[in-house]
Amino acid sequence: MCSVTQRIKSVKQPRGGFINPRQLDVESDLYERPRYPQEDENINAGLIGITTDYLTRYLFGTPIEVAFSVSIEGMRRLGKSPLSLLNKINGLDNKSISAAIKLASYDCVVRNGITAAMHHAPEKANQSTCENIRTMVTTSRDFLFAYGPVIESGIGFPGGYTDVVTSGDGDYLTANGLWDMKVSKRAPTKDHTLQLLMYWLMGSHSSLNYKYANVEKLGIYNPRLGSVFSVEIDSLSKETLHQVEVDVIGYKEKDALF
């Protein structure tokens, strides 16, 4: 019993990965990169990534309680109310971004089982951090408008989980693509591409499989690089799809789609 990301850490992939990142079509520097070097930021890179993702969802039209639902649940598990932070998030001003960072810091309570004693509130975000997040959220919205329409964000896979993989959620489902946001100064890795492939297969096995009938590509948008990375599903071998279905996710042979 593990999450998608936990399962990936325990899987030995073939040389280059089930989907070699070199297979990806790359559209470099489509969007403006953050103005300040990452080294100027004073908030953990992972937390910046989560904040950028959730703020993008919220400002793209997802209700704030849904966009930050995992973080809200994390606060509640520690006996804290999220209302004061939620009320401070109204846009992309520094006050909103700082509140979003603090709220997103509670994600780890749900995803990693962090306790109250282990949780440490992040320090106040400096100007470089706020400016970079502002830029990345803005370009992420531009990306979603260009590659949309977005059908769903924060995607679960009801009926698609197994005894091996019991949790995991994707970022964005569009009319013809399944997209993940990765806020990193590096290009995608084989773990990132496997994560996307698992999401698509789990979606195809889920009770919401009809939403995936027209998905033609898997892709990653990296707002720190301003770049888009994608692969056509038709370019993936049936052998690869079957191996990930059965050996990685844990579907039975008789239930395999490929």
Predicted features along the sequence, with ranges:
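Domain-level recognition of nuclease-like catalytic cores that cleave nucleotide substrates
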Residues: G219-F258
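Metal-dependent nuclease catalytic cores that hydrolyze phosphodiester bonds in DNA/RNA
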Residues: M1-V165
